[in-house]
């Protein structure tokens, strides 16, 4: 378990799992943070768990900041884009590529949206594993 500040200093190739327990501030931040996993070319996972309150809290923090209006507006737009990404049902790889000006016609087949089927997914085992990891780190 690491904070953003700690994570920025990590140069470790064998990170296998990155978990966000709230919405990152922007797509750029998110990509930087999840990019820490799988640097050695091996399989890795990134999880994003959030609630509607995350966006509300961050927008409140932006509004109450002493930053200039143009920066507040930019921060809110970036936050809206991040929330849209998190709530989307489209291929996550394609969404990220599009954000950075790239295009792909094919779905990745690896993200949660590409792997979902018509049936509901029982996330209880995955959630238990995640919560156990969080619990052990405190």
Each model region followed by its residue ranges:
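C-terminal helicase lobe
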Residues: 2-6, 10-138
């Amino acid at each position: 378990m690491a904070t953003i500040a700690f994570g920025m200093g990590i140069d470790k190739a064998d990170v296998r799992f990155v978990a966000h327990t709230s919405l990152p501030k922007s797509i750029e931040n998110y990509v930087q943070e999840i990019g820490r996993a799988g640097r050695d070319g091996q399989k890795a996972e990134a999880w994003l768990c959030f609630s509607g309150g995350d966006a509300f809290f961050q927008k409140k923090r932006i509004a109450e900041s002493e930053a200039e209006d143009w920066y507040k507006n930019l921060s809110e737009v970036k936050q809206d884009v991040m929330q849209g990404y998190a709530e989307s049902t489209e291929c996550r790889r394609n969404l990220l590529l599009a954000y950075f000006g790239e295009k792909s016609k094919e779905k990745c087949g690896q993200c949660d949206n590409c792997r979902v089927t018509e049936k509901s997914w029982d996330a209880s085992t995955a959630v238990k594993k995640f919560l156990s990891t969080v619990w052990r780190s405190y």
